Amino acid sequence: MARVCQVTGKAPMVGNNVSHANNKTKRRFLPNLQNRRFWVESENRWVSLRVSNAGLRLIDKKGIDEVLADLRARGEV
């Protein structure tokens, strides 16, 4: 699927634009996705991921090795 974070699974959600007159029209809220390369020291190679900003923060917190292990356990990488 397009526009889905590979780490967190965040995807677009649907909501409303609300005008001053309280008119509502449908819109999509897109996740803040970034294409990033991460150096994996244990494999001695670069890994490219499409991650949201929340996914980047999770990688900073847990480390790329642990996040990649979770992705491989889910069968996504």
UniProtKB/Swiss-Prot annotation:
Keyword check for tRNA processing: no
Record-level GO BP terms: translation
Keyword Ribonucleoprotein: yes
TM segment ranges: none
Gene Ontology CC entries for this record: cytosolic large ribosomal subunit
UniProt-listed SUPFAM superfamilies: L28p-like
Chain segments annotated as coiled-coil in the UniProt record: none
Keywords: Ribonucleoprotein, Ribosomal protein
One Pfam family it belongs to: Ribosomal_L28
Name of the protein described by the UniProt record: Large ribosomal subunit protein bL28
Signal peptide range: none
